[in-house]
């Protein structure tokens, strides 16, 4: 499976980070991913290559123009396929998470529209955008960083991109839970802080049990909202019940 990305951005140079480093660069080198950038400035019709203008009705900030953006999207569709889904990275979109990543992965190609300034002409959204996605409730200068975040998340989920399949399966959110704690050498730090004994035991069954317990506890402590969305097994529920009882009794002893 090869996934194709079309990027609509006035700063295509930013995507060198995806092309040149880490897992994503390796996926591109191995022809599992292709990235094509379409700069709206290349589709303007004036000598100043204007991509933005003032907002009707007044107000601060500039708005990205319909014409150069629509032309860039049309060219991207001609390159990637006329049915390619267009995703606009926008703070008004639905929140991006692991479930959304898996959903987007059903597409062989995606066009990611990166806005700037106050956003894009609303008519462009009406005519071209299939979905708006947000990476969180905060404001950024443009859609390039969110687009790279989405791309990285999708690329690492593609078959055979990661060398070890377990790396994907054991990631946070893969099963709806946060990841368990990780440790590496040395086994004991100079201050005496040591790796849990079970991880040094060589008993893979006990290690798996410990890791499952830690995933459950960590998610319960840090993201109760995730726990509430899961259908936990009776064994998982018992682990959490025991943890809550131990926590209460420990607190009572203090």
UniProtKB/Swiss-Prot annotation:
Reactions mediated catalytically: guanosine(37) in tRNA + S-adenosyl-L-methionine = N(1)-methylguanosine(37) in tRNA + S-adenosyl-L-homocysteine + H(+)
Localization: Cytoplasm
Gene Ontology annotations for the cellular component aspect, listed alphabetically: cytosol
Pfam families: tRNA_m1G_MT
UniProt-listed InterPro entries: Alpha/beta_knot_MTases, tRNA_m1G_MeTrfase_C_sf, tRNA_m1G_MeTrfase_TrmD, tRNA_m1G_MTases_N, tRNA_MeTrfase_TRMD/TRM10
EC number: 2.1.1.228
Gene3D superfamilies: 3.40.1280.10, tRNA(m1g37)methyltransferase, domain 2
Subunit structure as annotated in this protein's UniProt entry: Homodimer.
Family, as annotated: Belongs to the RNA methyltransferase TrmD family.
HAMAP family from the UniProt entry: TrmD
Listed name of the protein: tRNA (guanine-N(1)-)-methyltransferase
Annotated organism of origin: Francisella tularensis subsp. tularensis (strain SCHU S4 / Schu 4)
Gene: trmD
């Amino acid at each position: 499976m090869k996934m194709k990305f079309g990027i609509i951005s006035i700063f295509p140079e930013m995507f060198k980070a995806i092309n040149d480093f880490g897992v994503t660069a390796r996926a591109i080198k191995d022809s599992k991913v292709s990235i094509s950038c379409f700069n709206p400035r290349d589709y303007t019709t004036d000598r100043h290559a204007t991509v933005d203008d003032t907002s009707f009705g007044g107000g601060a900030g500039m708005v990205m123009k319909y014409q150069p953006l629509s032309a860039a999207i049309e060219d991207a569709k001609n390159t990637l396929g006329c049915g390619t889904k267009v995703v606009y990275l926008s703070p008004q979109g639905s929140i991006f998470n692991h479930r959304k990543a898996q959903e987007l992965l059903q597409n062989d190609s995606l066009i990611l529209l990166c806005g700037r300034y106050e956003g894009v002409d609303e008519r462009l959204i009406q005519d071209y955008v299939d979905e708006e996605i947000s990476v969180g409730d905060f404001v950024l200068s443009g859609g390039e960083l969110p687009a790279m975040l989405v791309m990285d998340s999708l690329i690492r989920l593609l078959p055979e991109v990661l060398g070890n399949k377990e790396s994907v399966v054991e990631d946070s959110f893969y099963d709806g839970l946060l990841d368990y704690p990780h440790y590496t050498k040395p086994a004991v730090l100079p201050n005496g802080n040591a790796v849990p004994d079970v991880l040094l035991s060589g008993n893979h069954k006990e290690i798996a049990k410990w890791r499952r317990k830690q995933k459950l506890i960590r998610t319960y402590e840090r993201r109760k909202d995730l726990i509430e969305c899961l259908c936990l097994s009776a064994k998982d529920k018992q682990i959490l019940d025991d943890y809550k009882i131990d926590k209460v009794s420990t607190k009572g002893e203090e």
